[in-house]
């Protein structure tokens, strides 16, 4: 009985709870709340009597709240859709850019990536942009529908010719245009400039070829000396670095500090063994600079050796190749005569070159003018000294010739010079007529062959020039013309005289020919011509 009562009470309670809970109807678009998943409580449960009790203001507020709630739910749904769409968008674009960056790293890895030693590196690449690639990039940037595969192919074809950055890229362009290294072009232009300067300044006409070649050899030797010293220094420095790398195992052994026991042990071991001390070699490499291993004398010796032996090496190499090619097609029995003929040809060439050495001076440039033979009038002035004002640092062959005294000449000197030049010209032309030929026009060697005549006392008539202030040995133009006429008139009578008298007269005139010499003797003139003496050009 009690059990039945308990069962009835439980059923009543269950039915009461079931009446409170609403039935969930998803098809009810008005009362079903999709956000919470429950049914809204309806206000129509109490019957028509309760609906009549609700005021119209409360119903409008409930409708407004429902609209706001729905708006919030819709906004939340839109945001969730946008986020989902962005995730899908990123999931499609990330692989494209991942592959693009991976390609850049692969191309840069071939040339070298930055590390601890090189913080940053620069690379150069060419960008190839086609029309299809441009359209795919524009679609991606504008947010239109795009295809990941097409964009991936477009980005993969953009970068080509990936290479390291070079700050001297202009050299590449220069070589592409001209096909020549700029350094070689500079050296060729420098040589052309030297040739232009040599020709334009006419140095080759002022300086002898022998002097030019000598200077070229000296300059080449000095340049080779500096060149060989730098080469030897670099070789010594490289050897020094290699020795330091080989002494690396002794760093810990030789660099540590030793006390007196360690130094004593080192001395004991070095005294009882013939092995070299590695620490000595180690400290020599650390202290001695390689520059002290290349003295100038070593560079000088090597330069002189190369200056002499290098040309001989090339000559010997060429001669060996020539003999090898010559003997290749000649039978063995004829090789010995051919070698003998070659030896004779070389000896004859050397002999001919030695004989032709004196002839080479004609190619050395303009020779100096040989000393001119002294004319009879010049022997009268042999007390005058020549002085030369050289120019051109020993290369130019010009000088100024004049007397040892004052450079300026007086009127008598100019007159005497004009007379001397006219007479010398007639003498060399072969015109030896009695009208122009004088004793002072003959060479001294011819005059010395005649017997000497003892001169007599000077005539007082011949010293009138000294009293009037004129120079001895000179006469006025009037006296010279009169004397010439007198002599021309006396030539027939002189032709009848004996040869001995003529020679004596020539000897006497030649002795009076120098300036300031003795005047002709009156007795000698009378003995020669039988008439009174007249003025002569020499006195």
Swiss-Prot record:
A Pfam entry, by short name: MCLC
Site (Ca(2+)-mediated inhibition of channel activity): 25, 181
Disease tied to this entry: NM2453 (NM/NM) mice carrying a spontaneous hypomorphic CLCC1 allele develop progressive cerebellar granule neuron degeneration with muscle atrophy and peripheral neuropathy reminiscent of amyotrophic lateral sclerosis.
Gene knockout outcome: Embryonic lethal.
Position of the signal peptide: 1-18
Stated family: Belongs to the chloride channel MCLC family.
Name recorded for this polypeptide: Chloride channel CLIC-like protein 1
Compositionally biased region (Basic and acidic residues): 364-389
Source organism of the structure: Mus musculus
Region annotation (Disordered) ranges: 41-61, 361-410, 444-539
Topological region Cytoplasmic: 206-215, 351-539
Effect of residue 298 to E: Abolishes PIP2-dependent channel activity
Domain of life, per lineage: Eukaryota
GO terms assigned for molecular function: chloride channel activity; identical protein binding
Membrane-spanning segments: 185-205, 216-236, 330-350
Gene Ontology biological-process annotations: endoplasmic reticulum calcium ion homeostasis
Stated role: Anion-selective channel with Ca(2+)-dependent and voltage-independent gating. Permeable to small monovalent anions with selectivity for bromide > chloride > nitrate > fluoride. Operates in the endoplasmic reticulum (ER) membrane where it mediates chloride efflux to compensate for the loss of positive charges from the ER lumen upon Ca(2+) release. Contributes to the maintenance of ER Ca(2+) pools and activation of unfolded protein response to prevent accumulation of misfolded proteins in the ER lumen.
């Amino acid at each position: 009985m009690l059990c039945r009562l308990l069962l009835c009470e439980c059923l009543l309670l269950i039915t009461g709870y079931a009446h409170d809970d609403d039935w969930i109807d998803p098809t009810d678009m008005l009362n079903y709340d999709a956000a919470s998943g429950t049914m809204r409580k309806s206000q129509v449960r109490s019957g028509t009597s309760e609906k009549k009790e609700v005021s119209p203001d409360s119903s409008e507020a409930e409708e407004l709240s429902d609209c706001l709630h729905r708006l919030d739910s819709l906004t939340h749904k839109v945001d969730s859709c946008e986020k989902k769409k962005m995730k899908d968008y990123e999931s499609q674009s990330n692989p494209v850019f991942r592959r693009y960056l991976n390609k850049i790293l692969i191309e840069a890895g071939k040339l070298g990536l930055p590390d601890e030693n090189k913080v940053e590196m620069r690379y150069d690449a060419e960008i190839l942009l086609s029309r299809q690639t441009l359209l795919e990039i524009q679609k991606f940037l504008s947010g239109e529908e795009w295809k990941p595969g097409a964009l991936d192919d477009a980005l993969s074809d953009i970068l080509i010719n990936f290479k390291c950055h070079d700050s001297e890229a202009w050299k590449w362009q220069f070589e592409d245009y001209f096909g020549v290294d700029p350094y070689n072009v500079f050296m060729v232009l420098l040589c052309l400039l030297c040739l232009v300067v040599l020709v334009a300044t006419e140095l080759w006409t002022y300086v002898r070829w022998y002097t030019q070649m000598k200077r070229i050899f000296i300059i080449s030797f000095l340049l080779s000396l500096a060149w060989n010293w730098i080469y030897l220094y670099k070789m010594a420095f490289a050897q020094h670095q290699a020795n330091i790398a080989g002494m690396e195992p002794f760093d810990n052994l030789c660099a540590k500090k030793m006390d007196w026991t360690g130094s004593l042990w080192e001395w004991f071991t070095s005294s009882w063994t013939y092995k070299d001390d590695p620490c000595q070699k180690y400290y020599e490499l650390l202290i001695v600079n390689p520059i002290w291993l290349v003295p100038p004398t070593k560079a000088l010796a090597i330069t002189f050796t190369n200056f002499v032996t290098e040309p001989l090496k090339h000559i010997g190499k060429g001669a060996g190749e020539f003999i090898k090619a010559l003997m290749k097609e000649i039978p063995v029995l004829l090789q010995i005569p051919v070698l003998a003929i070659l030896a004779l040809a070389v000896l004859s060439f050397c002999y001919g070159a030695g004989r032709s050495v004196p002839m080479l001076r004609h190619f050395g440039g303009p020779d100096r003018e040989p000393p001119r033979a002294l004319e009879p009038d010049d022997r009268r002035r042999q007390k005058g000294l020549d002085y030369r004002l050289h120019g051109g640092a020993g290369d130019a062959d010009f000088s100024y010739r004049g007397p040892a005294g004052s450079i300026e000449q007086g009127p008598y000197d100019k007159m005497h010079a004009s007379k001397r030049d006219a007479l010398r010209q007639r003498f060399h032309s072969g015109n030896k007529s009695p009208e122009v030929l004088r004793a002072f026009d003959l060479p001294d060697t011819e005059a010395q062959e005649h017997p000497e005549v003892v001169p007599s006392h000077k005539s007082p008539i011949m010293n009138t020039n000294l009293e009037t202030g004129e120079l001895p040995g000179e006469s006025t133009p009037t006296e010279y013309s009169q004397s010439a006429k007198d002599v021309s008139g006396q030539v027939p009578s002189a032709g009848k005289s004996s040869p001995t008298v003529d020679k004596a007269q020539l000897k006497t005139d030649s002795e009076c020919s120098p300036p300031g010499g003795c005047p002709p003797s009156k007795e000698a003139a009378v003995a020669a011509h039988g008439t009174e003496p007249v003025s002569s050009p020499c006195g």
